[in-house]
């Protein structure tokens, strides 16, 4: 197969970096373009280490900048679109989330048509499927069951619209007469080294004498390791570039999980961190129903204050539901169509994440020493 190139949007992020680390090993790949709003110095340093393997071009730009997207897509064979604003606490303005996640995706699809990019892989999220109620139990859910989020909260709503746009664009005619092939991947909650959520959670615990907050003990979910999600993107890319596999994959979405045990978010956090002296808060937590209605009251207060004051409650009904539902999904369709098998076992993923958390603990101790002296 002739030489090809790939654009990864949001490539400086948690998942994007892992995708790029796997991409460099792909056969006949001549260039990786990485588009992000800004690249942190440590990310630039990591990418510089890959320059000896492949041409790696870093592009700083806005997903809403049409000229930027046009230039980034020109001469590209594949687009992997991971860029998005992730916000479950409603801390980011709704307009910002809708613009980046929906309009940005639409503009990128249009840029692909103009630049005749034939393959588009979209990083969606499990949140486009729900959960809609903490009372509803979904175990080993499958794609054909058509679960769909009913939330109007900006993050799940915007990701749902973005995914629909991507799958709806499948089959579009490209400027050169070719055809655009698309698919979407819906990963579960992603954990692993560099996770911004896990990092914030652990830093919060470090500032609380190593006590982990206990707000998600009623959940039962199947988190997925970041390395396995990245691997699923590589397999989707290969499949959409294979004329024999395209007919079954184009316009489809896939749940991406792995063999991480089904457990609560609290249990996952504790398992990954207990080696470093962390412990779960032993205090009683509020019943879910009470948490839910308290969140509803806080949302009403936020709404009433909105004309004169911007008040963001520390939690909301969507977050309470997300954190306390039985909501697990199977990866059998990805296994069948993409040939997906987890690249990392649970033991490997657990060990790598534990070691990273250990490095956070070490950094925290060094910071405290510096403050004392």
Curated annotation (Swiss-Prot):
Q: List residues binding NAD(+).
A: 159
Gene3D superfamilies referenced in this protein's UniProt entry, alphabetically: NAD(P)-binding Rossmann-like Domain
Full protein name: 3 beta-hydroxysteroid dehydrogenase/Delta 5-->4-isomerase
- Annotated keywords: Endoplasmic reticulum, Isomerase, Membrane, Mitochondrion, Multifunctional enzyme, NAD, Oxidoreductase, Steroidogenesis, Transmembrane, Transmembrane helix
One GO molecular-function annotation for this sequence? oxidoreductase activity, acting on the CH-OH group of donors, NAD or NADP as acceptor
Origin organism is Bos taurus (Bovine)
Name of the gene encoding the protein in the UniProt record: HSD3B
Q: Which InterPro entries match?
A: 3Beta_OHSteriod_DH/Estase, Lipid_A_modif_metabolic_enz, NAD(P)-bd_dom_sf
Q: What is its main location?
A: endoplasmic reticulum
């Amino acid at each position: 197969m002739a030489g090809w190139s790939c654009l990864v949007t949001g490539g400086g992020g948690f998942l994007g970096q892992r995708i790029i680390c796997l991409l460099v090993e792909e056969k006949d790949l001549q260039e990786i373009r990485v588009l992000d709003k800004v690249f942190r110095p440590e990310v630039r340093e990591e990418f510089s280490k890959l320059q000896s393997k492949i041409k790696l071009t870093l592009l700083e730009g806005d997903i809403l900048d049409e000229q930027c997207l046009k230039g980034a897509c020109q001469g590209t064979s594949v687009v992997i679109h991971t860029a998005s604003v992730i916000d479950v606490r409603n801390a980011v303005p709704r307009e910002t989330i809708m613009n980046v996640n929906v309009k940005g995706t639409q503009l990128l699809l249009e840029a692909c048509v103009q630049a005749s990019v034939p393959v588009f892989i979209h990083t969606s999220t499990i949140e486009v499927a729900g959960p809609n109620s903490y009372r509803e139990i979904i175990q080993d859910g499958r794609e054909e069951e058509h679960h769909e989020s009913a939330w109007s909260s900006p993050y799940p709503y915007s990701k749902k619209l973005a995914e629909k746009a991507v799958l709806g664009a499948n089959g579009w005619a490209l400027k050169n007469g070719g055809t655009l092939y698309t698919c979407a991947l819906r990963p579960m909650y992603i954990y692993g080294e560099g996770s911004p959520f896990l990092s914030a959670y652990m830093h919060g615990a470090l500032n609380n004498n190593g006590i982990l907050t206990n707000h998600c003990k009623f959940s039962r979910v199947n988190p997925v390791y970041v390395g396995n999600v990245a691997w699923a993107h590589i397999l989707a890319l290969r499949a959409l570039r294979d004329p024999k596999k395209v007919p079954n994959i184009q316009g489809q979405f896939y749940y991406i999980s792995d063999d991480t045990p089904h457990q609560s978010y609290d249990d996952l956090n504790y398992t990954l961190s207990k080696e470093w002296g962390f412990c779960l808060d032993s205090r009683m937590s509020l019943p879910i129903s009470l948490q839910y209605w308290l969140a509803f009251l806080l949302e009403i207060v936020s709404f009433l204050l909105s004309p004169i004051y911007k008040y963001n409650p520390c939690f909301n009904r969507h977050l309470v539901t997300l954190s306390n539902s039985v909501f697990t999904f199977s990866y059998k369709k990805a296994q069948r169509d993409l040939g997906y098998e987890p690249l990392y076992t649970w033991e490997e993923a657990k060990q790598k994440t534990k070691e990273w958390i250990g490095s956070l603990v070490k950094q925290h101790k060094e910071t405290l020493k510096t403050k004392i002296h």
